[in-house]
Amino acid sequence: MASLIYRQLLTNSYTVDLSDEIQEIGSTKSQNVTINPGPFAQTGYAPVNWGPGEINDSTTVEPLLDGPYQPMTFNPPVDYWMLLAPTTPGVIVEGTNNTDRWLATILIEPNVQSENRTYTIFGIQEQLTVSNTSQDQWKFIDVVKTTANGSIGQYGSLLSSPKLYAVMKHNEKLYTYEGQTPNARTGHYSTTNYDSVNMTAFCDFYIIPRSEESKCTEYINNGLPPIQNTRNVVPLSLTARDVIHYRAQANEDIVISKTSFWKEMQYNRDITIRFKFANTIIKSGGLGYKWSEISFKPANYQYTYTRDGEEVTAHTTCSVNGVNDFSFNGGSLPTDFVVSKFEVIKENSYVYIDYWDDSQAFRNVMYVRSLAANLNSVMCTGGSYNFSLPVGQWPVLTGGAVSLHSAGVTLSTQFTDFVSLNSLRFRFRLAVEEPHFKLTRTRLDRLYGLPAADPNNGKEYYEIAGRFSLISLVPSNDDYQTPIANSVTVRQDLERQLGELREEFNALSQEIAMSQLIDLALLPLDMFSMFSGIKSTIDAAKSMATNVMKKFKKSGLANSVSTLTDSLSDAASSISRGSSIRSIGSSASAWTDVSTQITDISSSVSSVSTQTSTISRRLRLKEMATQTEGMNFDDISAAVLKTKIDKSTQISPNTIPDIVTEASEKFIPNRAYRVINNDDVFEAGIDGKFFAYKVDTFEEIPFDVQKFADLVTDSPVISAIIDFKTLKNLNDNYGITKQQAFNLLRSDPRVLREFINQDNPIIRNRIEQLIMQCRL
């Protein structure tokens, strides 16, 4: 059968040379990277401690988290939190007005039973009984006395996981924190002459203004944010706060350091970012009532604007990440309105905008440090898209809005059709806004986010204003330009080729002859015969097959096999990665576990549709593992793929891996599977629809989910090439014998060919629907 190609790829897709895997890991790893480049660093990574950056105006901006500072004695200013970060137990801070208030804070490690300890507090040895019964949290205790030689009392305590504490002078009181993280709260002690209270810190500390008290509370409860700098973080003396800072202009170039061949230049720039979204709307074949996909795609935009009297030409590329897939299914009839998938960006999504302009700042964006940006927010509101149905009122997808807020900046490379541009990538987090979006004339209403249908709402572009600053290592000779790191546009060219190839593949669906397709689906296609129609295949057969298998290893089908084998402990102990598809077929425990899981689901989920859908998602693997004589969906999928490869004028060895992988995932998305028990047939689709009926009369009977799960474990699973509705329609209009019904239920290819050769319109229409579902 033609589906042999998929089974062959599943079996062999994990056979990858170690060197290839090491190279792949090295080229794709993008997380948990530690950077310590030092001066004149040659690195493509930017610092990721995203602060407000350099503020290039006349406004003085107070830092949110100032420090860390070394232990010392000083008189902290009023209305400033002193955030203490101790590392060892003991006295961490003392404060007194030398009149009637002596306050100290002690840190006690976890799991300490009640015991006497000696502490030196204000220069006096004090005996205190302390305890901390928590197994994992540290305990801060305030000890207070009202005279220099008086007795000490213990007061409000704080149980803390982050091991942070804070003190502030405000409104004639000393404020501290109490309670238990992550729900710690502020408390206070009244004191006279509070503004003259001197504090002695015995650990590193930070300064936070009272205006940012909410952030201070967040740090107390959850810990300090991760910090990554180009150099080690070393606590400074508090006198460092008195250093005079020279303010920079909004647009200027500053020489930081210079040698004979290299110099460090600081570039400060105002920036105007204009961008737009792009989308793809794909309509399914058939009568015109169904849409297969509405999705975002990257959008390039070129424009000019004036900066300090100079005209600047800029180029942006807007892309999205973390999209949410929505769908609407109005029914299974050919005239029912269906949108299989439309993408929406929400608060869990990100928008990336790559920016480049022709100014001096971007001539040598190769070796960069101290990269920072300060950008405004922007609101993006969706428009309306009319689903033009052949008959009836048109549904309209309308509304939706999100706001974009700056969340970081790093280096990137934009690929255009002619040149690569070293640029800055601005990352934006999203917040959903009013209005909501809805699909009119349906029950899809009051949903939030920005759909891909009309994200620009008729606007030519969205605009964001802001500033950025960076220090770049550049040649001392201004006439020399450092080479761009990625000077070729291989991936961009490949994406363009794939886009054109997908359009060609989808158009070729109309040219496939069904009788030839059935014959081709019966052939045992392997990798060589599948790709034999491609030019240069024989010369590059080995490398191309390896590339196909490496790409296929990441496909949804391969991941389904891995997930199944990993999740079933009984089967996983005896299944190796290389033979997973064979082992699943012979491992009864793997499919018995499906039945067990369905029993568990039925106790918590009352919907039969949900349960059958859960089983059906694994039936493709079950069917492939227990191959029968009947034809299956993967046979048709592989046959259509082979036919389109042979007919295509744009296919090449470079695009084959992506096309084969996409075909395995996207061809025939609406599948149904059946199991036969004597004269009873149980049929379920991955969309949750299910039927149970008699073979001879096609009369529906109650659907027993548990029995269906048990049959899946013990019986062959068959692709419902001719589904129940088509069979019933065929029987009602033409009448079929019980033997013909059995043959069609088993997807017997000979019987299918007979009906097609007889030009039976019902069977031909069903096969045409399956072919039209073979889209990329």
UniProtKB/Swiss-Prot annotation:
Region (Spike head): 65-224
Site positions (Cleavage): 231-232, 241-242, 247-248
Positions of short motif KID motif: 644-646
Membrane is among the record's keywords: yes
UniProt short sequence motif DGE motif, positions renumbered to this chain: 308-310
Motif (YGL motif): 448-450
Coiled coil: 484-511
Example GO biological process: virion attachment to host cell
Region Spike foot, residue ranges: 510-776
InterPro entries: ConA-like_dom_sf, Rota_A_VP4, Rota_VP4_MID, Rota_VP4_MID_sf, VP4_concanavalin-like, VP4_helical
GO CC term (a single one): host cell endoplasmic reticulum-Golgi intermediate compartment
Highest taxon of source: Viruses
Residues under site feature: Binding to sialic acid: 101, 190
Spike body and stalk (antigen domain): annotated segments: 248-479
UniProt keywords, alphabetically: Capsid protein, Coiled coil, Disulfide bond, Hemagglutinin, Host cell membrane, Host cytoplasm, Host cytoskeleton, Host endoplasmic reticulum, Host membrane, Host-virus interaction, Membrane, Outer capsid protein, Viral attachment to host cell, Viral penetration into host cytoplasm, Viral penetration via permeabilization of host membrane, Virion, Virus entry into host cell
Region of interest called Hydrophobic, as start-end residue ranges on this chain: 389-409
Disulfide bond entries: 203-216, 318-380
Sequence similarity: Belongs to the rotavirus VP4 family.
HAMAP family reported in the protein's UniProt record: Rota_A_VP4, Rota_VP4
Misc. comment: In group A rotaviruses, VP4 defines the P serotype. Some rotavirus strains are neuraminidase-sensitive and require sialic acid to attach to the cell surface. Some rotavirus strains are integrin-dependent. Some rotavirus strains depend on ganglioside for their entry into the host cell. Hsp70 also seems to be involved in the entry of some strains.
Protein's recorded name: Outer capsid protein VP4
UniProt organism field: Rotavirus A (strain RVA/SA11-SEM/G3P5B[2])
